[in-house]
């Protein structure tokens, strides 16, 4: 399930502190997202896995490289200057030597791949509470704080969105932004087909399980602690997508 998987393992404070204030709406939206995933994104993800490993790795590397455009300002806003410098070097090296991000040259030069950062995480670092848990149509699990963070991205906080959808240059168009987001989601979904099938199969309450996984992983990302969930990877290309 694309909508749970892409957002659910992508990343808010403690489960015990976050209330499910709109549970009826959330469950209905969760069911809708599950249906859309089953008829659209899961089949696409399964087909995507038949592509040669270099193509899949290149796609993953490229969308990961693009994500640095939003991660770097959030590193700075959170006072994580070392991470900001690391991600800036990754962006420069992989965009140039890595041929617009197709190859992860930066890792081989000592600039490690770090977790993505977003405005929801920045708001948490600034002391804003998570608010209520919410499941958004298509976008999946979030919180009130996370939703505000997403709104900030669309209102000018995401440089990649500005470059494409806002036509800041003549080289890109809005379809490039949405294609990159779609590619990122399908790539992640393809790597975690078995993982989510297992969660769904072994969960007494799938909705509750996804909610718990999302909130736990969000807390991990905000606190910058260790990994909770491993994603599938193309080991031959040293390519791991844990977001």
Model-inferred region functions:
Residues 54-57, 78-85, 107-108, 221-228:
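Surface-exposed patches in mature extracellular/periplasmic domains of secreted proteins
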Residues 12-16, 126-243:
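A structured, mid-to-C-terminal "fold-capping" secondary-structure block
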Residues 11-27:
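Short N-terminal segments immediately surrounding and downstream of signal-peptide cleavage
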Residues 4-12:
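Sec/Tat signal peptide C-region and signal peptidase I cleavage site
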Residues 39-57, 109:
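Membrane interface segments of multi-pass transport proteins and intramembrane proteases
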Residues 24-25, 54-61, 84-94:
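Alpha-helical scaffold segments that form or flank carboxylate-/histidine-based iron centers
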Residues 65, 72-145:
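Mid-length scaffold segments of soluble, non-membrane domains
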């Amino acid at each position: 399930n694309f909508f749970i998987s892409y957002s659910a393992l992508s990343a808010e404070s403690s489960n015990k502190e976050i209330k499910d204030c709109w549970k009826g709406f959330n469950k209905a939206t969760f069911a809708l997202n599950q249906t859309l995933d089953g008829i659209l994104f899961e089949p696409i993800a399964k087909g995507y896995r038949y592509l040669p490993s270099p193509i899949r790795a290149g796609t993953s590397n490229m969308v990961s490289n693009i994500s640095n455009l939003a991660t770097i300002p959030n590193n700075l806003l959170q006072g994580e200057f070392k991470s900001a410098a690391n991600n800036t070097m990754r962006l420069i090296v992989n965009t140039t030597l890595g041929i617009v991000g197709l190859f992860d040259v930066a890792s081989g030069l000592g600039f490690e791949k770090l977790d993505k950062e977003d405005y929801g995480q920045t708001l948490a670092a600034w002391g804003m509470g998570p608010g209520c848990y919410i499941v958004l149509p298509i976008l999946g699990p979030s919180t009130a704080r996370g939703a505000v963070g997403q709104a900030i991205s669309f209102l000018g906080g995401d440089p990649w969105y500005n470059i494409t959808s806002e036509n800041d240059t003549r080289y890109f168009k809005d379809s490039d932004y949405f294609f990159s987001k779609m590619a990122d989601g399908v790539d992640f979904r393809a790597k975690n087909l078995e993982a989510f099938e297992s969660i769904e199969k072994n969960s007494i309450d799938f909705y509750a399980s996804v909610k718990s996984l999302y909130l736990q992983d969000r807390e991990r990302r905000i606190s910058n602690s260790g990994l909770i969930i491993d994603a599938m990877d193309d080991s031959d290309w040293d390519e791991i997508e844990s977001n």
